[in-house]
Design a protein with these regions (language model features):
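Symmetry-related core transmembrane helices of the 12-TM Major Facilitator Superfamily/SLC fold
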Residues: 171-188, 369-388
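Helix-loop boundary and gating motifs at the non-cytosolic
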Residues: 9-62, 214-221, 225-252
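Structural signature of the two symmetry-related core transmembrane helices
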Residues: 84-98, 278-293
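Helix-loop junctions at membrane interfaces in 12-TM secondary transporters
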Residues: 101-113, 295-307
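Juxtamembrane intracellular "pre-TM" segments in multi-pass secondary transporters
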Residues: 5-16, 187-221
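Helix-to-loop junctions at the C-terminal end of transmembrane segments
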Residues: 67-81, 164-165, 263-276, 362-363
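Cytoplasmic helix-loop-helix junction between adjacent transmembrane helices
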Residues: 114-148
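Interfacial helix-cap and linker-helix signal at transmembrane-aqueous boundaries
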Residues: 44-45, 75-76, 147, 162-167, ...
Length: 398
């Protein structure tokens, strides 16, 4: 079996052969998020769900991101058929998504979103593992490839934002279907990658997970995801209630992602100069500032624009650095499950917590307190990641 360095040198030269296939998957996957995150709550509001019901329904996807990826990651590592698992999951996700066209009841929508999200959430951790395996030792280049997901997000959020100033929000369902079909198409174009041998292969994966430095990283990232829960659940409703047009809502979402793309492109240089851990610390610090600005400065457009620019740090830099660290920590046969567990315990569990608390806090205490809670959770994450600022994250796998 090839060593890590031999595998990287052999395969990184072929990245361009599959560049657009991987980029296409990222494009449609995040185009779906660009449809879902800003506008699904508005669609639910249009069919007369309450704030608490919207909070619950918007938390279904994070719940599935917590429960499903570890199962799919185990299946991919156990069978050695990572790509096949992605394809099956993409197919079933598209099939179950069709249910949104036939239900407007709370329990019906809950069931459809749960089934769709169970399979939808399976794909990305496995594709992340595939992409990073394919890049080999050149993981800093991940950001440039991942930036095509941001392009898909922008196209979706801006296009739909302008469209919904003229057409009914119910057309959102068709945009989601197009994205699901794109995911399905490109899942069948992805490269199959070999898993390089690593000396941690004989260790149970929980031996790695339970290392103090790894637990601190997971805990901090859990809090960052929880902090973003209110943003993804109520930000669009928040803006509309303060008089912003839907096209302006789309523009503000897009601004953050445009800046995110810039960070992804610059990530190889930033990672080389500062390292992933320092980038994480800066991301958490800026998240505290950003959420306070969103909560208390929504009527000041200039400050709101600055808050959206900070999305480059609170998601773009944060995501690239955290995924890079997870790839260093979980190597060899643990790659798929490592990324899957990271997705489950951070984006899944953290997003679920943030989404679930957002409904009651929004309804009883208002948006100011809701986004102050987000800032507080980011502050707690900053404390955890700062605790490990000596760089032990990246050394934990060795």
């Amino acid at each position: 079996m090839q060593t890590q360095s031999e595998y990287a040198d052999t395969h990184v030269t072929h990245v361009k052969n599959y560049y657009w296939r991987i980029a296409g998957f990222y494009f449609f996957y995040y185009a779906f998020i660009g449809m879902f995150a800003p506008y699904w709550s508005l669609y639910l509001q249009s069919i007369r769900f309450s704030a608490v019901e919207i909070g619950i329904l918007m938390s279904v996807q994070p719940v599935m991101r917590m429960l499903a990826p570890s199962l799919w990651g185990w299946l991919a590592d156990h069978t050695g058929q990572r790509l096949r698992v992605v394809q099956v999951a993409a197919t079933l996700s598209a099939v179950f998504y069709l249910g949104v066209f036939v239900t407007t009841s709370f329990w019906g929508m809950l069931l459809v979103l749960a089934l769709m999200s169970f399979f939808w959430s399976a794909s990305m951790p496995l594709v992340e593992a595939t992409t990073l395996s394919y890049l080999g030792k050149h993981t800093a280049r991940y950001g440039r490839l991942r930036s095509w997901g941001s392009v898909g997000f922008i196209g979706s959020v801006v296009g739909l934002g302008y469209a919904f100033d003229y057409i009914a929000i119910s057309w959102l369902l068709w945009a989601g279907l197009i994205s699901e079909l794109g995911i399905l198409l490109f899942s069948r174009q992805l490269p199959e990658t070999q898993v390089a041998a690593h000396h941690t292969d004989q260790q149970p994966i929980f031996n790695i997970l339970l290392r103090p430095s790894v637990m601190l990283l997971f805990g901090a990232c859990f809090l960052m995801s929880a902090a973003h829960g209110p943003y993804y659940t109520f930000f669009s409703i928040y803006l509309v209630e303060h008089g912003y047009a839907k096209s302006a809502v789309g523009g503000l979402w897009a601004l953050g992602v445009i800046c995110e793309i810039g960070v992804f492109i610059l990530m190889p240089r930033l990672a080389h100069r500062y390292g992933f851990t320092r980038i994480l610390i800066a991301s958490f610090a800026l998240a505290v500032i950003r959420f306070m600005m969103i909560g208390w400065c929504v009527d000041f457009l200039v400050l709101l624009l600055i808050a959206q620019v900070l999305h480059a740090a609170t998601f773009g830099a944060y995501h690239a650095a955290s995924v890079g660290l997870i790839h260093e920590l979980f190597q060899g046969k643990h790659q798929s499950r490592g990324q899957a567990m990271f997705g489950s315990l951070t984006y899944g569990a953290g997003g679920m917590l943030g989404g679930l608390i957002s409904g009651p806090v929004w309804q009883y205490y208002g948006a100011n307190m809701l986004y102050t809670c987000s800032a507080f959770m980011a502050l707690l994450g900053l404390i955890l990641v700062g605790w490990n600022s000596s760089g032990r994250f990246s050394q934990a796998a060795y």
